[in-house]
Amino acid sequence: MQQNREKFSSKFVTIVVMVGAAVGLGNIWRFPYMMGANGGGTFLLFYVLFTVLIAIPAMTGELTLGRNTRSGSIKAFETAMGSIFGRYIGWILVMCFLISTSAYLVILGNLLSASIIAASSGFDARSIPEYEANFANGWLQYMFAIVVLIGALFVVYLGVVRGIERVSKVIVPLFAMVLVYLVVRTFMLEGATGYMLEFLTPDWSRVNNDLIFAALGQAFFSLGLGGTIMVIYGSYMAKDENIINTAASTALFDSGAALMATLFIVPTVLFFGLNMSQGPTLLFHTMPQAFAALPGGHFIGSVFLIALFLVAFLSTVATVEAGGGSI
């Protein structure tokens, strides 16, 4: 057990870092679509239910494991189980997580490429051909993915306080302000409130196994659970910090970010008569068309895309820290 292990500098910063790790692309390009495909408000209610009853307790367990062992997943599971079998479990979790991260890096590299285009020429329908050309260039994709990885490695190299804390304290509040601004601008559109109320109204006829498992999966996916990130971040928590409060606060802000993204994306897409989609299609095809029709959309779209890249970058930092800190 590492008694001299680095620790987060305050309880508030701990929550900021946790939120930065949890909020990512899944909250922005997956959550709104999942709501739309699964009955809107019905999906939201089940998502909240599973978050409160299952995801928050699971996060509490992961944070507790990390703090009590003062180590990453591999050593933490070995210590908790008291056998080499626990070490194997830790290795499996870390390796699975790192493998899935390789795909996330490519996506984030595409997002970095798109952010550069947006900063120079805006983020609207006119830029779609340029995005597609970049995404079709495999070498360019790998180059940007490597740039993102190097950036994440550098932040981790700086340490918990000088690296992870410092970038989180800048990016998380910035992203929150951008989301608030986008939601306010969206609800200035005529009829946006009506679209949102209709979308949030539960449709109980949509309740089935697919909806239930989708909501359960989103609750776990959204908080970054899986025995890696929250274990390593838990190892940096102070002994006197209330883990339950930290887990609940992280879940609250993470879910709030997902809901605010929905409040921005759904009314905008419906207002302009576009089809809801998910993943890259939503981000690089549907949203540019919406921004093109939105007053001031050239600027608003650029701000949105750059802020999204920055907050998604924090998830990559957390992944690199979880992998490097566990091995």
Tell me what each language-model feature is:
Residues 1-29, 56-63, 67-79, 84-88, ...:
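Membrane-interface "cap" regions at the ends of multi-pass membrane proteins
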Residues 2-6, 33-38, 68-92, 105-161, ...:
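Inter-helical loop and helix-membrane interface segments of multi-pass membrane transporters/permeases
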Residues 2-4, 8-10, 165, 169-317:
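Membrane-embedded translocation segments of transport machinery
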Residues 6, 35-61, 89, 257-260:
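Extracellular loop-to-transmembrane helix junctions
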Residues 11-50, 101, 186, 190:
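Transmembrane alpha-helical insertion/packing segments
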Residues 26, 46, 51-63, 73-75, ...:
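Central hydrophobic cores of alpha-helical transmembrane segments in multi-pass inner-membrane proteins
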Residues 47-55, 93-119, 144-158, 173-186, ...:
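Hydrophobic core segments of alpha-helical transmembrane domains in multi-pass membrane transport
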Residues 59-63, 67, 106-114, 158, ...:
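Short helix-terminus and kink motifs of transmembrane alpha helices
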